[in-house]
Every structure is written in structure tokens, then in C-alpha cells.
Amino acid sequence: MKYRHPLRDILNRTRSHWDQDHTPSAARWAFGKALQCQTAELGAEVYVGDDGELIVYHTCKSRACPSCGYRANMQWLRERWAALADGSYKGITFTMPDVLWPIFRDNPHLARALPALAASVIQGEASARYGSRVGVMAILHTFNGQLEFNSHVHTMVSGGALSAHSGTWTTRINYNREQLMMAWRRAVIELLRAALRVGVLQANPTAADEMEALLAKQEARWWSIKIQSFKSREHFLRYAGRYVRRPPIAQHRITFIGERSVRFWRKDKKQRRRVYVTCSLEEFIDRWAQHVPERYQHTVRSFGLFAPRPLSQTSDAIFVLLGQKQRLRPKPRPWAVSLKRDFGRDPLLDSTGKRMRWIGRLPPNTYRHTNQ
């Protein structure tokens, strides 16, 4: 069965559950805003044409809203596409043993440090092997196909590097998987040990000796590191864009919403087929809530040559070294332009093809009857 707004429907049905103190404040705020999206609660713009008035309600811009997330994601893709030079890129995914996932779930302040750790590992490897600087874009990813907590970091790394001494561009940089794994494992374990020493680590087991034994055991394990080569930045950006501004589950994956349960599908990569997952509405909301980032938390972070300040200083040089013309940063598209470009329909044209004109704005919580 297809639902027009399945996530909003689930939020409406479970409001008495998630609108409580036990829900993380960021998720509670985001869920509330998502329910107000495109309603009189947020106000509206009023347009008039030969057919009458058109009321266009404001959007919420919440990270839990699939509609707003799509538009924000497309704008992010356009900006990143313009800022990065053409060429090859590498995608490196840093994972960790599943026994460490609950620790980072219960300590989000430590999870926020993982992108910087991953970037430092990559930069250290490039500096040690080539004496060069690379650009790194890191995205903290906290969920799997079942919406369970699974902390890992996706990174996009420039395929080439800028020599720290000669200022020349090295066209190809290769990484040793084992060296990256050992450096990543060491960095994560040291982060947890440092947090344990200063008393900012909340985890089960809580005893310091038990935690140290757990970390020592993970220090002897092999941690999975995945390295991919992308022919262009577009390949990675489209892949990463799914996790940047959108909710952790696409709406088309939800196949059934009942009075007490919800069913959705996930991909089984080993068997190459869809697997259906059924859980209660409350459990679905709880899983979703743990993946909503803090309101002012950056989901994408840039380091090295991609960091904001170095990028402004070295971007011109990189484009010149690669013989490419630098592109201007694209301006945000108005909502009507976005709809026309993405769906082929101009919402501000009336039935006669004439353009409607703006006549005013409705403040929040104002209801107004419209003929359309």
C-alpha cells in the first residue's frame, strides 16, 4: 500500500509517546516541526490570479521532514558540485565493532568527534607516505537498514594531493588499508580511554576495569575499512546525499501502517533481496529519534584542503593546477523554481496560464479559506 505522507502519519499516531521528556530534545523539536510543515501553524504566502487565491504554507526546514530534506539535499549537492574540482575521488568508510555502538549512542558528544578522528587518520597517512595534504569530507552515519544504531563514518577524499613543500599536485594517492585500520582503531580506543579517565563516559559496563577489559579486547580485533574509487565527485555526492539532510528512512520503504505496528523493507546485501521488518509504532519512533542530530550539529564536516578556510585560500590554486575553470557558488533556488525544475510544473501559473501575483503574508496560526 502506498501512503502519501507515511512518516507524518506515524508521527501523528504516536505523538503521545514521543512528545515526552524521555525523547531526545532535538528529535522532539524536529518531530513537532515536521508535523507543522505546510500548515497554518507556520504561516503562509498569499498569491492571487484570475481563478482566485492560492495559499502557499511555509515549510518547517526540519531534518526530520522528508519534503524539506529533499530540497535541502539538492541545494547541498549543487553547492558541493560547484566547489569541488573535476577528477577522481576515493570513498573510505570507517567502521567499528558492534559492541562499541551502544557507547557512542549513549555518548553523542563522543560520536560527534568521530569525523575529525577519521579525517586525521587519512591526513596522517597521506602526509607520512607522500608529504602531501588532501581534502577530506566526513559524514557521521548512525543507522542501518533496520534503523538500529550503527556508528560509522563515510569520507570522501580527494584523489590527488597538494605537496606541502613544492606546491605541486600529485594526481594519484593510494592508501594502505591495514595502516588506516590500525590508526583508526587506535584513535577511537584512545578517545574512549581519555573520556573514561576524565569521567565523561556513560556506558554499560560502568566500572572502569570492565570498560578497560572491553577496550583491550577490541584493540586486538580487526576493524573493517572499506576503500572505494569514484571516477568523479558526483558518484560520492549522490551516495552521501542520502544521509545528509534526509530522515534515516525513505518514505517509499514503508509498506504498511497499522493501529499498532509498521512494516518497512530493507536491502539484504548478501542475499540481494528485500527483507521486511515489522515493529510497533513506538519502537519505530524510538529508533528514528536516536538518529536525529542536534539542531546546530553539522552532519557534514570538511577537513584539510576541503576545510572552509584552506578551501578559500587553495581552491583557486587547485583549479589552476588541474587546468580547470572555477565555478561560482550556486544561489538557492526559490521554491517555485525548484518545483518547476524537479517536477515540471510551475505552481504560480493559474488555469489560464497567467502568472499569479503575491499580495501578502499570513502570520502563523492563521486559517484562511481559499477557492483553490
Task: Write out the residue ranges for each language-model feature.
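Beta->alpha loop/short-helix hinge microenvironment recognizer with preference
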Residues: M1-Q372
